[in-house]
């Protein structure tokens, strides 16, 4: 585990762009179904609904999901390293997919994406020092605000987790219609009505206020956004749902976690702007 943490650090020490990724469980379910049933497969509606609800891909139609699969697999090719094998039910299917798409990759453990699990000397986050860093997440604004409380959140670990010289650039992402139910604070801005347009929205934000490093946690959009940013010379790491933890933003999912729950103190906050149907996402696990 520590050796792989050093490997992640080595990517950040180098000035080259890279993509360090991870596959979410819902993404793996859809990809496995596609591989098993062939390119002309019709996805079951329940699976397409899951991809929208849990991972933000909309609309939940055959055409939309087919396009997402092709773009996602294409984006995987940009991965230099990936946290894999953590989702036990589809571990073998994931390995077969990655072996065919990116045979030459650095394989990581899921925890290698989360620097607070490691000693200061092997935390990749310390290399964010003096960099412009984009936070691409639904709670990006809260995350950025929390950086001003870094010392209160992380104590003497703060400089190696949220360096005080980092310039943070929040790019707020939103929720699919099934979750946001038209709420202005949590819906993608009009006229966005498909997952492809959400990618364009995020990239437009990057062009307006560029950064050198991106920390991403935005469901099944993340790998595609990450691949596009890597092509634009950005160093990218997909932390997934754990993104908020780095910034002292807690959620139900971690309240009983044997390690992460011990980090919580009065400086930690819950996310603002809960979408109408947040409970559909694992009983509002991020709030």
Predicted regions and their residues:
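C-terminal functional extensions of proteins
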Residues: 225-287
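Cofactor-binding loop segments of dinucleotide-utilizing enzymes, especially the Rossmann-like FAD-
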Residues: 138, 173, 241
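Glycine-rich phosphate-binding "P-loop"
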Residues: 103-109, 166-201
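Electropositive, gly/pro-rich neighborhoods at or near active sites that engage anionic ligands
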Residues: 1-167
